[in-house]
Curated annotation (Swiss-Prot):
Organism: Leuconostoc citreum (strain KM20)
Matches recorded under InterPro entries: GHMP_kinase_C_dom, GHMP_kinase_C_sf, GHMP_kinase_N_dom, GHMP_knse_ATP-bd_CS, Homoserine_kinase, Ribosomal_Su5_D2-typ_SF, Ribsml_uS5_D2-typ_fold_subgr
Family recorded in the similarity comment: Belongs to the GHMP kinase family. Homoserine kinase subfamily.
Gene field: thrB
PANTHER family: HOMOSERINE KINASE, HOMOSERINE/4-DIPHOSPHOCYTIDYL-2-C-METHYL-D-ERYTHRITOL KINASE
UniProt name for this protein: Homoserine kinase
Example GO BP: threonine biosynthetic process
Length: 291
């Protein structure tokens, strides 16, 4: 049995729209069992198929059709349509499965390029594959990526609402055009945030994480709890609160001691959901073989 384990991811980190992302210690696990005559996908999601039409198998087939079907078991801690990279994790699991079963010998760089091409942007797939926190850009031909350090004591307090928010719906909330001056401001904020994060300048990062210009203001009507959580978090010494990916999940970054205090403060939000705390996953996608 081959086991592929892919972490959840949180994209944007505030102003790093479609470019910044980090991996969290929630996981999708794909187990590849015995060969079969047709694809069998065993999972507990009521609305997903159990055959060749499952997204993981379809992702694998984008690389090659020269694969013997197998019995697959999918287990996931990553909630669907919540802004935590569930589709990116499934995509990478499928591509990695194809790489193994068809002996394609693709490098991680080649897997990343294929995943980014299918996803359209690298901010989820890059940290899911490589682990840690990553800044990345895709020009339509090549993926450029570089990691940056986040200290061990930083905890991610993750509020996951009970409702789904499809990425397409969240994308539709964004304008087709953007004012030039606001674009410059957004770019400058993002650039400075990356430099601050790369240099462990948390005082500067703290002032910039909540200054996004590109998407949070346009999506706040879809995620009213963002401002509510941000207001509560400001009463503690946190680094910042941001919309994870397209939402509706909201994440607050804070040192461990402050995170412990923050958690019970988020128990009575007006939006129903659950709050968990995660660490940065530094290993990314892993493959193990078991007898």
């Amino acid at each position: 049995m081959i086991k592929i384990k892919v972490p959840a991811t949180s994209a944007n980190i505030g102003p790093g729209f479609d470019s910044l992302g980090l991996a969290l210690d929630l996981f999708l696990t794909l187990e590849i069992h015995e060969a079969t005559t047709t694809w069998q996908v065993i999972h507990e999601e009521p609305d997903l198929p159990h055959d060749i039409t499952h997204f993981i198998v379809q992702a694998a087939l984008t690389l090659t059709s020269n694969m013997q079907p197998h019995r697959l078991v999918v287990k996931s801690d990553i909630p669907l349509a919540r802004g935590l990279g569930s589709s990116s994790a499934a995509l990478l699991a499928g591509l990695t499965m194809a790489n193994i079963l068809a002996d394609l010998n693709l490098s991680p760089k080649e897997i990343l390029k294929q995943a980014t091409m299918l996803e359209g942007h690298p901010d989820n797939v890059a940290p899911a594959l490589l682990g840690g926190a990553i800044s990345a850009y895709y020009d339509g031909h090549q993926v450029y990526n570089s990691s940056f350090h986040i200290p061990e004591n930083i905890i991610f307090t993750v509020f996951i609402p009970d409702y789904e928010l499809k990425t397409a719906e969240a994308r539709n909330a964004l304008p087709d055009d953007f004012p030039f001056k606001k674009s410059i401001a957004g770019s400058a904020i993002s650039n400075t945030l990356i430099a601050a994060l790369a240099n462990d300048d948390w005082q500067t990062a703290k002032q910039l994480i909540e200054k996004d210009q590109f998407h949070e203001q346009q999506r706040h009507h879809l995620v009213p709890h963002l401002l509510e959580i941000r207001h509560i978090a400001h009463q503690h010494d946190v680094l910042g609160t941001y919309l994870s990916g397209a939402g509706p999940t909201v994440i607050t970054m804070a040192p461990e001691n402050e995170a412990k205090i923050l958690l019970p403060a988020l128990t009575h939000l007006t939006t129903s959901g659950r709050t968990i705390q995660c660490h940065l996953n530094r290993s990314g996608l892993t493959i193990t073989k078991e007898e």
